[in-house]
Amino acid sequence: MKINQLRVEDVCDFIGGSQPPKSEFINTPEEGYVRLIQTRDYKTDEFPTYIQEKSTKKFCDSQDIMIGRYGPPIFQIFRGLTGAYNVALLKAKPKSCIDREYLYYFLKQDAVFQYVDKLSARTGGQTGVDLVSLNKYPIRLPEDILDQQRLVSVLSALDAKIDCNNRVSGELEAIAKMLYDYWFVQFDFPGTDGKPYKSSGGKMIFNSTLKREIPEGWMNGTLDDIGKIVGGSTPNTEDPDNFTANGTPWITPYDLSRNQGSKFITRGLQDVSEKGLKDASLKKVPVGTVLLSSRAPIGYMAIARTEMTTNQGFKSFIPIKSYSTAFIYYTVKGALKTITHYASGSTFKEVSATVLKTVKVALPDPRVVDQFSVSVASVFERQDLLELENQQLTQVRDWLLPMLMNGKVTVA
């Protein structure tokens, strides 16, 4: 296999996006409009933006390699969306000498990220990719395109399995969410006769506090009635003894941003030591606790897979006797718009425990909650296993990636 020693500028071009005025943005698609892809869109599909197609000449398709230009975190590598793209994204356009998949995996290497992150300038509190430095980065490139494709085929196969697992988990999530809505939003949970309660004429009572009808026997309450709400804190980061490699998982909102697409979380980037727990008066939350980021940003959620703790950017819900993890998860998720609306703060928006205790919810008959929890238990268990398998596949892929790129591992 003949290898060429080149630089990034020899194998691809970087094309910046455009930024039409926000006054032209709309939130629902119309004829003549195209989606404006932003960094956030690769993490959530909840806030799409559309612009007139004629207002830009910068477009990408689902196969294009897109790079997050600003941070933190800087230099995120994306693909999978079609539309126009804004100035916060770069498109890496491969030249004829390199296979697109090979370029994609090359740019995803941690070594490349560390190089870019170290040399990219920080201005106005925001880091931007230094393209001059990136273009000088060396790349070891097999001359034959077929050799390039052979090398990355292993990585593509691992990613295909991860994507398959994600699709299955997404389908399971749709089933569980549909059941929750059917029972607790439409009130068609199984009645005593086994028939859908409201549709079969189950008695509904107007609740003056909630200002709507709820099933007879249900009550009004607030979010703190379905789980014990606890916060977190941060140990002194200047004392290295407060952190350790294998201590208690300590979760930050950034960890949840990296965990988007997953329902459960095991740990973040850092663990705290026993000293850190004590010095910051950190409280451990048990398995099954529902984590909610309460600032920077608000609304990221995950379920604790192990005993853990969090920083001050969280309000976590520890399940109490009558309400399960599954019920809390979907109830809080359904209240996110209200929660965000009540957020306050001059520097950045934040939701306090006091605010959460004012968010009104309907409190079902505990027997209905128990029945729901049993019904979705297998879904949650299957999703958990799929996510754990994906973690293992990701570890294998991330180990193989630099080995394949530097020639320490070859593919026959």
Would you name each region that the model predicts?
Residues 1-19, 140-152, 156-182, 200-234, ...:
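Non-catalytic DNA-recognition/assembly elements of restriction-modification systems
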Residues 83-90, 101, 123-152, 294, ...:
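A short glycine-rich beta-alpha junction/loop motif
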Residues 101-133, 324-362, 412:
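Short, positively charged
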Residues 38-39, 50, 55-110, 252-254, ...:
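A short beta-sheet element
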Residues 5-26, 31-65, 85, 204-210, ...:
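Sequence-specific dsDNA recognition surfaces
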Residues 261, 287, 324-325, 329, ...:
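Hydrophobic/basic alpha-helical segments
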Residues 194-199:
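Short, solvent-exposed loop/beta-turn-alpha elements that line the ligand-binding surface or hinge
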